Amino acid sequence: MTTTSTTSVDGRTSSTLKATLSASGPNSNGPTPAVLPQKPKLTGWAQAAAKALPRQQQQQQQARKDDSVAVQPANTKTKTIASTAPPANIKGSSTANGSSTNKKFKRANKQPYNREEVRSYMHKLFQSYTAGEKSHSMKTYKQVLSETASGRVSTATDWGTVSSSKNKNKKYGCLSDIAKVLRNQ
């Protein structure tokens, strides 16, 4: 049975809808009040965490929840509060010997970056190019400029063009192209 009433609070009128359910017998066709607590649908991380729990632990938690619901009064206005005690066996918790079950494994120890070693290698490499025997393929910057000005530049040493179709219009030399030229000379 549904009734509508109008109430006045502080001079304001508001209509409220009250639904009252009579106790239904076995022969009544009306709705029966359901007192069974419904589980909220788990989504996102809560659903993944629930799936990750072992079956036995889920049953233990369900039994704990049932016990806590049975102790509380059957008043419909009070909310059911589940126990907030942490479960005994969750990933990342400590085991009996004190070690964590979800340890992050350390990466293999790398040697630290040795700036002095790299600096000395680059210096030796530079010295070998400048002080060593100059091959006929090595050119100084002045030689390249003079060849460019005279128009005698081959395509291999034309730094204004790029062989890649992606960077065709751009007027800079790709490092890979420069490396190819240096290797071929």
Swiss-Prot record:
Organism lineage string: Eukaryota, Fungi, Dikarya, Ascomycota, Saccharomycotina
Residue ranges, compositional bias (Polar residues): 73-83, 91-102, 147-166
Additional facts recorded: Present with 1560 molecules/cell in log phase SD medium.
Protein name, per record: Protein PBP4
Species, as recorded: Saccharomyces cerevisiae (strain ATCC 204508 / S288c) (Baker's yeast)
Location relative to the cell: Cytoplasm; Nucleus
Positions of region (Disordered): 1-116, 147-168
Gene of this entry: PBP4
One cellular-component annotation, GO: peroxisome
Chief localisation class: cytoplasm
Quaternary structure and partners: Interacts with IGO1, LSM12 and PBP1.
Keywords: Cytoplasm, Nucleus
